[in-house]
Amino acid sequence: MLNNSTRNLLARTLASVTLAATSMTLHAAPQAMMRSNPRVSEIRLEVNLYSVAATTVGGLSTGRVAAFRMQNVEVAMPVMLRSTWCDTDFDKVAVRSWIDGGEIKLDAAQVFKRNADSAEGVFAFNMHTERNGFAELRVQATYLVQRWDVTVDEGAAAAVTWPRTWPAGTSRFLAKEPGIDPTNTDIMQCAESASPGGSRAVTPFYAAKNAVIAILTRWKAMVGGSGDRNADRSLRGISFSSGAFGLSVGRGSQLELAAACVAAVRSVQIPARIVYGLSVDGKNGASSVINFRFICEFYLPTIGWVPFDPLEMRSQGAASRAGRGSIKGFANVSDLSDVLPLGLQITPVGYEKADRFAIWGWRGVSAANVDSENATTRIRLETSSRGNGKTKSMPVPMIDPVP
């Protein structure tokens, strides 16, 4: 569990941000974006590195192959302090870790690390074994979250005008990053021409909406699902296209579509980002199927980070509904509270992907030390209901929690 000083600092930070954001939101736009129907859940997030092959002697299995030939590795699972629809409770955090079945005791206060000036953090497990390798490693974090439904007053959002400057902390969400390129000429032209007279001829809400619809109009085919799976159907990594993808060919995976939409919104100079998350299909428990979910957001002054889901918009025929009518999936997103937000980039800062991009990352690993024929990884999520939250509704905080 987190020690008192760490827990109190996080509590004060979140409380001050909530009060400030609520006050600012109430003053500027009383009900432009509201949280409601809070649900509290216990989250158990786990990353597992393991061997799929057994060691045999004389035809008898003697255990699994040590497919990871290393003594040290650091595994980082992302966590978000707050998102548009979710707050993390750090009052009761537990971490556990194992190598080849033997538990390694770690202090949660040392494992949790918060990124500076961001709503992002990680559970960083620094693992060590005296042996020259291992067949299985597991790291696990358990904590509470409170998730809300989010309702956006689209009329109020559409009335917000262009600011002189965007708030501090949003500049990174205007820039180019791996997989998201707002400087791509095709994307820039597509997004800018989506609004009659150009993006500045309409308010930011419509500029963003028109840019996303323009991308969807040219995106003719979806490739694969949200994630790749192991033989046991456990979730291994994010799905990517095996062939040509993107706006130029009008096809791609769920993440590739989300990245193109965010790039388009950034290209018209509106901060936008992908919130990488997981959702559970089915009831509580480990037997439920989990999937990656990619929720996009763009920033509006006096309102905050407005969500949209290109996949839902596409299912609603958004590509053929250009104009100012409401489209489900843009601003008002279905089943948003079912998503556990984990991070704002595909791999935590300072870490590398393992065998797949899968939101979590590792460091201190050389490819030469991994038996790629026998090694694999998976990410697991279990959620358990802990009842309803006490605050039935509240404005969405406008800003990410920063010191």
State each model region's role.
Residues 1-9:
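N-terminal secretory signal peptides that target proteins for export/translocation
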Residues 12-25:
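Bacterial N-terminal signal peptides
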Residues 29-150:
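Intrinsically disordered, low-complexity N-terminal segments that are enriched in acidic
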Residues 53, 81-83, 318, 322-403:
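Alpha-helical and coiled-coil interaction segments, frequently adjacent to or embedded
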Residues 79, 143-145, 158, 276-278, ...:
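A mature extracytoplasmic/lumenal domain signature
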Residues 92-100, 249, 311-316:
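Short, solvent-exposed aromatic-acidic interface loops
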Residues 137, 147-253, 368-388, 398-402:
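Secondary-structure boundary elements
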Residues 256-356:
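Hydrophobic/aromatic-rich core segments of domains that either
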